[in-house]
Structure formats: structure tokens, C-alpha cells
């Protein structure tokens, strides 16, 4: 007689099965120190009160030096209400396990840093010396340069964001300088019925060039863009969504455009230095009272007549042409620049904590790893090593 099965399941189904469990990463708790910027005319701060609130709500601590946000119009009270701790003790801020700065720390500030600290700031490789890297190495610091942090699409979010500000600002500054109150030609930067529009020449079709063109076109100016990359010129037309005068940098065409224009914006980048695109002779041929805004002055400038100026004394006149050659244009708008930088920093900080610390984040995020130039006191950036003739190691051999 055939026995009835006691279970509706097959013999195979009744065998013990492997259970797949989700492996939870242990979240890290961040203790972030934000010192007051001491660099000349630097008014920005890395995090807004809203960003601090988001971090504190996620269980992190933020210690801010008193007055750090004043330049960007964020008071100590704003940060305190967001959950930050405020101190007047600079050394206490620099003793935090993680330090956020806009400008790279000075040699005196590095002395205040504890060993094995994580430093996130700009690197500004062109302004550094071997002493800076030796000081970081002696403290066994893990350092990230935010201008080298790469996004998933291959772009550099911090550089792009600040370039957008610089591009838009260059047009607003030119508009101000053209007005009679600033000893300009008394011309309005706009499209007024019956009045010929302003002629603007933009050198360089990168992010700065794109946003300068966008702003100038929005104000009704006639815009001509020059760049030696056909791909970039094609791209700027697509981004702006309208036909535009574009040309490669040919001296004859450029001189013709310079003679007629009211404003020239220089935004040409080079590998080590910006190439000089506009010669002294070309500047002499320009209109009296025309405006030169050299955005690429931080890399040497692309006008032969360019000399570095400051936010306090931003202009000088040479060959009857007004020159504006301030290296750090976004610092003119510290609050906007702060919000922009903060929007980039905050997701990265939350992700670092979620991954269980900087080590794991560097392991999983190639873009963040690209910004690393020191790992526990070992130089990992090839470009820094070659620039300063320093020994460097491949980060992929240190983190795997």
C-alpha cells in the first residue's frame, strides 16, 4: 500500500538552505573642525548652517571657529542654532580628526594639526612649496584636494561650480565697469530698442566661457566665442541652444573682433600656464574705454598686458583699456560661493560616514580617490610628485 506523504514539500525543499544576510556597514561618526580663513580677501566657508544641520542630524559633530562665517554673512548664532559648537580657540578647531578649509592651511596651521588627521581643502598646486608637503608628511595626514575630486561623469564638480560663478560674474563686473560711475564709457550692458548692443568677445569655450556667454546673451549683447577646440565650440552652441559666432583663435579674425568689441573676457586655460592669446599690439588697437576681464589670471593670464590686481583695487588702465585682473573672482560673492561649495561637500561627507570612514569611501569611490594627494603621510599624487620632484606611491597599491 502506497504511503501518503506527511509534508506538501519535496525532500529537496526540506533540506537546510543557505540564508543570504545583508552585510551592514558600520557607520562612522565624523567630528569636523572648520577654522576661520586667514588668507588675504578669502571670505568663504566650507559649510552653510543648513549643511551643518544635516550633518548634526545624522549624528556628527561640527566645531566652528568663531567668526568663520562672517565674511559670507553667516553668523555664529546661525551655526549654533544649526547644532554646531562654536569656539574662539583656533588650536581646538585644528585638533579635530577631520578639518575642512577653503584655502590650503599655512605652515603655522599645520603645526596645530594632530597626527593622522583628515584634511579636505583646496591644494592650489601652483602656490605651494616643498615645505608644505614635508609638513603634511611629518603629521602623517590624509589629505584631499577638492578641486581634483571627480564626478561620475568625469567632470570636476568644485572647479565647475566655481567656474560657473566666475563666468557669470565676469559679465556683471564688465557691466558695472562700463557704467559712467566707474569711469567707463557710460554704456548700458543691455539690448535697448534703437541702441546698438554691446559687443562681447569671449576667449575660451569651457565652463567659464559658457556661463559668460549665457549671461551676456541674456542681457542682449552680441557675443563672439574663440577657442582652438572645435569640439568645445560645437558643445557651447549646443549648451546655449542657439546659433552663435564661434571661431578658432586666428590672429586676423581675433584682431578684427577686438577692434569692434566693448568687452573681452579671457578664460583660456593651459597645462601649466595660460597661453598669451592677446598681444600688447592687439590691446593698443582696442577702443578707448573697452574692458578686459582676465579670468585666467590665476594661471598667468591670457593678455600680454595683464597684471594681478586685488578686490580692493581691481582695475588699472593701460593703452586706454580698463583691465580687471583679480585672481579669485568667486570670493567677490562669498555667500553664493559658500552655498555652492557646501552643496558639493555635504553629500561627500554624509557618504564618507555611511561607508564607515574615509578608508572605505576611497576604496569604493574612484572620483574621491582622484582627489587624494596624501595618504597617512605618503604622497599619492603623481602630478604633485612630478611638479615638485618628490617621491610618490600609487594609491591603488595602498588601498585595495
Question: What do these predicted regions represent?
Answer:
Residues 41-46, 109-112, 269-278, 302-306:
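Glycine/threonine-rich flexible loop motifs
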Residues 1-31, 37, 107-198, 326:
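Glycine/serine-rich phosphate-binding loop and adjoining beta1-alpha1 elements at the start
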Residues 126-153, 281-325:
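Rossmann-fold NAD(P)-binding glycine/threonine-rich loop
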Residues 35-36, 40-69, 181-266:
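Glycine-rich phosphate/diphosphate-binding loop of Rossmann-like nucleotide-binding domains
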Residues 52, 76, 110, 133, ...:
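Generic hydrophobic/aromatic pocket-lining and core-packing "Φ" positions
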Residues 147-173, 177-188, 302-400:
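Adenosine-phosphate binding glycine-rich loop
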Residues 16-135, 139:
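An N-terminal-biased, well-structured beta-alpha scaffold segment characteristic
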Residues 91-107, 241, 245-277, 291:
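Rossmann-like NAD(P)-binding element
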Amino acid at each position: 500500500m502506497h504511503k501518503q506523504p506527511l509534508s506538501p514539500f519535496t525532500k529537496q525543499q526540506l533540506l537546510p538552505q543557505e540564508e543570504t544576510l545583508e552585510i551592514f556597514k558600520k557607520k562612522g561618526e565624523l567630528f569636523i573642525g572648520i577654522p576661520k580663513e586667514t588668507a588675504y580677501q578669502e571670505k568663504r566657508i566650507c559649510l552653510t548652517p543648513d549643511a551643518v544641520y544635516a550633518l548634526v542630524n545624522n549624528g556628527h559633530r561640527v566645531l566652528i571657529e568663531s567668526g568663520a562665517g562672517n565674511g559670507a554673512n553667516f553668523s555664529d548664532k546661525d551655526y549654533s542654532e544649526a547644532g554646531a559648537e562654536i569656539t574662539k580657540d583656533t588650536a581646538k578647531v585644528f585638533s579635530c580628526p577631520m578639518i575642512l578649509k577653503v584655502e590650503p592651511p599655512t605652515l603655522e596651521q599645520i603645526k596645530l594639526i594632530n597626527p593622522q588627521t583628515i584634511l579636505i581643502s583646496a591644494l592650489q598646486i601652483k602656490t605651494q612649496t616643498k615645505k608644505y608637503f614635508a609638513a603634511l608628511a611629518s603629521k602623517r595626514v590624509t589629505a584631499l584636494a577638492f578641486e581634483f575630486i571627480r564626478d561620475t561623469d568625469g567632470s570636476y564638480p568644485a572647479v565647475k561650480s566655481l567656474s560657473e560663478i566666475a563666468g557669470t560674474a565676469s559679465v556683471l563686473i564688465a557691466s558695472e565697469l562700463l557704467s559712467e560711475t566707474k569711469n567707463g564709457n557710460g554704456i548700458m550692458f543691455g539690448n535697448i530698442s534703437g541702441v546698438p548692443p554691446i559687443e562681447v568677445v569671449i576667449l575660451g569655450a569651457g565652463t567659464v566661457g559658457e556661463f559668460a556667454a549665457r549671461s551676456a546673451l541674456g542681457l542682449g549683447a552680441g557675443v563672439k566665442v574663440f577657442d582652438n577646440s572645435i569640439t568645445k565650440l560645437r558643445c557651447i552652441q549646443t549648451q546655449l541652444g542657439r546659433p552663435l559666432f564661434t571661431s578658432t583663435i586666428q590672429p586676423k579674425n581675433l584682431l578684427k573682433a577686438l577692434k569692434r568689441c566693448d568687452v573681452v573676457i579671457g578664460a583660456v586655460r593651459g597645462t601649466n600656464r595660460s597661453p598669451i592669446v592677446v598681444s600688447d599690439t592687439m590691446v593698443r588697437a582696442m577702443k578707448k574705454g573697452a574692458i578686459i576681464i582676465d579670468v585666467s589670471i590665476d594661471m598667468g593670464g591670457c593678455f600680454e598686458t595683464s597684471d594681478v590686481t586685488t578686490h580692493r583695487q581691481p582695475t588699472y588702465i593701460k593703452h586706454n583699456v580698463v583691465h580687471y585682473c583679480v585672481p579669485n573672482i568667486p570670493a567677490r560673492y562669498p555667500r553664493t560661493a559658500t552655498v555652492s561649495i557646501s552643496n558639493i561637500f555635504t553629500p561627500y561627507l554624509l557618504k564618507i560616514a555611511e561607508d564607515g570612514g574615509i578608508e572605505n569611501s576611497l576604496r569604493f569611490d574612484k572620483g574621491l580617490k582622484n582627489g587624494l594627494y596624501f595618504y597617512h603621510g605618503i604622497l599619492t599624487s603623481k602630478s604633485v610628485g612630478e611638479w615638485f620632484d618628490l617621491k610618490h606611491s600609487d594609491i591603488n597599491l595602498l588601498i585595495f
